[in-house]
């Protein structure tokens, strides 16, 4: 009987050790190019390559083609483009990446559902202020940003944990898309209900 108890303890210790082992990131190979070959652009490229090794971004990578461009606004298409902001903050840099990939979720996987999603978002959150910095300056894309920013938050929670993810969202709420991020922070459950109705997920 004591031997069985000891064996059980050993098996439990082994199981805990296996669960605790760091998992190897499985991010697909990213095709990252710099627009001008500038040192700061190369630094941003290296940052993204490092983050792709540190975190498993497979679930959050729809397009693998990434352009790094000084002075550009981050945008998702036709090629996902990241600027040089957040070189000193990995969490914010990572959030910018998953944010732009979130646009690809809507473009590639939910294109046919987008009209109904827009109507539901507009009905659920009427009178959204769309002028910058509250929105992005355009009605439809400001409403779609509610979905994209929620996808961003979900991804960040999975990658860096709820506490750090919330800090990112709170920082962004003070920086840009302030009305959109405020909706997420104050009405998260309602936002998620809308997304669930239309199958918006990673």
Can you describe what each PLM-predicted range is?
Residues 2-11:
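Bacterial N-terminal signal peptides that target proteins for export
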Residues 20-22:
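N-terminal signal peptide c-region/cleavage motif recognized by signal peptidases
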Residues 56-68, 112, 159-170:
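Surface-exposed patches in mature extracellular/periplasmic domains of secreted proteins
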Residues 81-98:
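Short pre-active-site segment immediately N-terminal to the catalytic Zn-binding motif
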Residues 90-91, 95, 107-145:
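Post-HEXXH active-site segment of zinc metalloproteases
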Residues 102-106:
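Short active-site segment of divalent metal-dependent hydrolases/proteases
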Residues 157-202:
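Pan-zinc metallopeptidase signature
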């Amino acid at each position: 009987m004591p031997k069985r108890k000891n064996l059980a303890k050993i098996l439990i210790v082994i199981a805990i050790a296996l669960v605790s082992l760091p998992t190897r990131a499985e991010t697909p190979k990213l095709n990252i190019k710099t627009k001008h070959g500038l040192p700061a652009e190369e630094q941003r490229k290296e940052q993204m390559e490092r983050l792709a090794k540190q975190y498993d971004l497979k679930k959050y990578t729809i397009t693998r083609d990434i352009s790094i461009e000084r002075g550009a606004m981050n945008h998702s298409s036709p090629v996902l483009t990241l600027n040089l902001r957040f070189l000193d903050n990995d969490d914010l840099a990572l959030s910018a990446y998953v944010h732009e990939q979130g646009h690809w979720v809507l473009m590639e996987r939910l294109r046919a559902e987008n009209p109904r999603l827009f109507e539901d978002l507009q009905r659920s959150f009427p009178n959204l202020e769309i002028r910058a910095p509250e929105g992005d300056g355009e009605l439809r894309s400001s409403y779609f940003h509610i979905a994209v920013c929620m996808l961003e938050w979900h991804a960040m929670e999975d990658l860096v944990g709820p506490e750090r993810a919330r800090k990112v969202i709170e920082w962004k709420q003070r920086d840009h898309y302030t009305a959109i991020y405020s909706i997420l922070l104050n009405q998260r459950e309602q936002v998620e209900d809308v997304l669930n109705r239309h199958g918006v997920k990673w």
